[in-house]
Regions:
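Short, intrinsically disordered, charge-biased short linear motifs at domain edges
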Residues: 9-16, 197-203, 279-292
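Radical SAM enzyme [4Fe-4S]-AdoMet core and its adjacent flexible, acidic
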Residues: 110-255, 259, 312
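Processing junctions and N-termini across compartments
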Residues: 15, 19-22, 208, 293-296
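Conserved alpha-helical substructure of the radical SAM core
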Residues: 1-95, 99-110, 114, 119, ...
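Short cysteine clusters
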Residues: 21, 25-28, 214, 232, ...
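Flexible mid-to-C-terminal extensions adjoining Fe-S/redox cofactors in radical SAM and related proteins
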Residues: 239-333
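Extracellular structured ligand-interaction cores
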Residues: 12, 218-220, 296-299
Length: 333
């Protein structure tokens, strides 16, 4: 029987609205591209919003991402209903493909603002720039600021990449806006999802989050275009079957969400993080050298553990050694 005291209520609903994108980044976490058409319908999203606001009053934010959510003609309606009918703060994540000119950018941002949008985030970096020029991002930032937003720009980053957030400090117009706190920018972690072994051989010394606990899991409800509820929206979650909680079109969201609290591994990830779990596993698998993992992103370590029957088997066999301590720490978070 479930120990209901372990359940942590989510605060964010995320729709991966579509796998279709104007771009086809080589290491997209959901492998999106113009060739993929699977999309959450208007009716599906509205139904999920109604369910979530009824059954999860703790949820206050709706995030619309993809793929590229702005290609959906009914996006303004989804924003309008979520914002004005259900009182959710709504955020979108976009590659700004629509910001070819300042005027086109201003028109799009104004439309989204009128619908009830609260926050707008942009993604860029080496792979994004193959499809969306940095000038588009600049247009989108300026247009968003003019419409009263404080946009957030996430830059895919790794030591070997050419483009990073310093661009925004060197551009005269953008640096002024940045100094005035009119928009925000950060270097987001990038992972070579198609060749993770290469990252293990040459780890990025700029990564210092490997030893952190996972605060993504248990924080939200993530629904994908194929009607799957995910345990998190981490950058490798689309490649980890273990994090698939089920089909919310067939089983109520609350049932699927609550069931994950029967899983000690997920509780442990939330409490200690993937690296600490790997350190425990390494006691029983001497081939694992922890120093080789200290500069890998925690999502990559998590993926390695959750996709390995052998490593999960070690946890299953020995978890009772740490169970009481982890549950105590978990309840203090």
């Amino acid at each position: 029987m479930k120990n209901e005291s372990l359940v942590k209520e989510p605060n964010i609903l995320t729709f991966v609205t579509t796998y279709k994108c104007t771009s086809a980044c080589n290491n997209c976490c959901f492998q999106c591209s113009p060739k993929r058409n699977l999309t959450l319908s208007r009716e599906q999203m509205l139904d999920y919003i109604e369910q979530v606001t009824r059954d999860f009053p703790s949820v206050k934010v709706l995030v619309l991402t993809g793929g590229e959510c702005t290609i959906l003609k009914y996006l303004p309606e989804i924003i309008d209903v979520a914002s004005h009918k259900y009182g959710l703060a709504v955020r979108i994540v976009s590659n700004a493909h629509w910001a070819r000119t300042y005027d086109s950018a201003r028109k799009k941002v104004a439309e989204l603002k009128a619908a009830g949008l609260n926050e707008i985030n942009f993604s860029t970096g080496d792979e994004h720039l193959e499809f969306v020029p940095i000038e588009y991002i600049k247009n989108a930032i300026i247009a968003s600021v003019e419409e009263g937003f404080v946009p957030y720009v996430n830059v895919e980053s790794i030591e070997s990449h050419d483009f990073n957030s310093t661009y925004f400090t060197k551009d005269e117009e953008l640096s002024t806006l940045l100094d005035e706190n009119k928009f925000k920018v950060s270097n987001g972690i990038w992972i070579d999802l198609k060749n993770p072994e290469a990252m293990m051989k040459k780890p990025d010394k700029g990564i210092h989050c490997s030893n952190q606990r996972c605060d993504n899991i248990f924080s939200g409800l993530v629904i994908t275009p194929d009607n799957r509820l995910k345990a998190c929206c981490g950058i490798t979650s689309g490649r980890v079957k273990y994090l698939d909680l089920g089909n919310p079109a067939k089983i109520p969201l609350h049932t699927l969400y609550d069931k994950q609290f029967d899983d000690f591994v997920k509780i442990w990830l939330h409490t200690d993080g993937a690296l600490k779990i790997l350190e425990f596993i390494a006691k029983y698998d001497k081939r694992i050298k922890i120093e080789e993992f200290e500069h890998l992103h925690q999502c990559l370590i998590c993926t390695m553990i959750l996709n390995s029957e052998k490593l999960l088997g070690i946890i299953k066999e020995h978890y009772d050694e740490v169970y009481a301590n982890i549950i105590m720490k978990y309840n203090l978070i």
